[in-house]
Swiss-Prot record:
GO terms for cellular component: cytosol; nucleus. It comes from Schizosaccharomyces pombe (strain 972 / ATCC 24843) (Fission yeast). It comes from the Eukaryota. This is Enolase-phosphatase E1. Binds 1 Mg(2+) ion per subunit. Its main location: cytoplasm. The gene is utr4. Pfam families: Hydrolase.
Length: 216
């Protein structure tokens, strides 16, 4: 019996286009000003470069690479924080997501988030969503500080002492699902508008909508 629902964000609960076309460009346009204003006080910036100039070069390089590097994601998240708090950014959720989360909670399940974005960035995403502040619905958040999403060890840590068969992980990424499946979690491949076409589902159940979670 599934007791814990573990959700990816990009391409699963929210659109890839919001992240690629809104969040990433928003951060990219503000790297220089952020470095100029925060280099001395931001530990993560100093980890990215021994000088402000080097930190900026590395920020732009990591951005271009689509990197999941921890310090880079922390800086990115702080830039987004300003955007959310100034109402320049409102995160996107597919309309079936909130009803599914509410239904899960009614059934006694716990809901968790696992994303490559930093935990602070995850919380901002759900605090400033187009469905309102949803933070009350989640029991926990995981990012790459616990491990990469494509590594089995990450899911071992998330599950902890609980039974992996009590967990369902939903993601649009086949490699993430394969890692979770090896650990014993239930898994589902989420297919959303704007996601990359899926040629081979690798035997994963396909979810075009979270409504499928509650159908007999």
């Amino acid at each position: 019996m599934v007791k814990n629902l573990l959700l990816d964000i990009e391409g699963t609960v929210g659109s890839i286009s919001f992240v690629k076309d809104k969040l990433f460009p928003y951060a990219a346009s503000r790297y220089e000003s952020y470095v100029n204003e925060n280099y001395e006080s931001d530990e993560n910036l100093r980890e990215l470069g021994k000088t402000p100039e080097e930190a900026l070069i590395n920020l732009r390089k990591l951005h271009a690479e689509g990197s999941k590097e921890r310090s880079f994601k922390m800086v990115q998240g702080r830039i987004w924080k300003k955007g959310y708090e100034s109402n320049e950014l409102t995160s996107h959720l597919f309309p079936d997501v909130v009803p599914a989360i509410q239904r899960s909670l009614q059934l006694g399940m716990r809901v968790y988030i696992y994303s490559s974005g930093s935990v602070p960035a995850q919380k901002l995403y759900f605090e400033h969503s187009d469905a309102g502040n949803l933070l009350k619905y989640f029991s926990g958040y995981y990012d790459t500080t616990i491990g990469l999403k494509t590594e089995c060890g990450s899911y071992v840590k998330i599950v902890g002492n609980s039974n992996p068969r009590e967990w369902l992980f939903l993601s649009d990424n086949i490699n993430e699902l394969k890692a979770a499946r090896k650990v014993g979690l239930h898994t589902g491949l989420v297919v959303r508008p704007g996601n990359d076409p899926v040629v081979d589902t690798s035997g994963f159940p396909v979810y075009n909508s979270f409504e499928i979670l509650f159908t007999e």
